[in-house]
Amino acid sequence: MTLRYDVGIINPFLDAVVGVLGMMASMEVTLGKPYINSKRSAAGDVTGTIGISGTVDGIMSLTLDEPVILRIVNNMLAENYTEINDEIADAVGELTNMIAGQARQDLTKQGMTLKSSTPTVIIGKGHRISHITSAPILAIPFSTPEGSLVVEVSFESEGTEPA
């Protein structure tokens, strides 16, 4: 496999999660150990996915436990949501877009030219989505007192072999 996930790729996504959640939701997250997702799917209560294209093509997904997204949105909007609804789904799409956008901005400083698609949001307790990519999927887990969230990133490059 020719594609390696070095800190130049990983750090923009780490920084984006920490920055966006800190700024928008006054929320601190604890980084877990990044790993390659060999199951090639994401499982959780709500997921936002976004396509990234340009110098490299890829995807980013943000998967959250229900208590985590409820706290984020309640902090952002000064509300008291108790279940996932349309407003929560909209917020997941916006968070996905903001995290991908911040990471893209940092990757642009490294000489990449990237743009994003419109996010798609998948809702359902314990849902599982399959990533449609032949490239390795890097999972970056974070924890909060309410539960976990995972950002998954996969970039295709010339010569990338199916995992």
Regions found by a protein language model. Give the residues of each.
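N-terminal auxiliary interaction/assembly segments of multi-subunit proteins
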Residues: 1-163
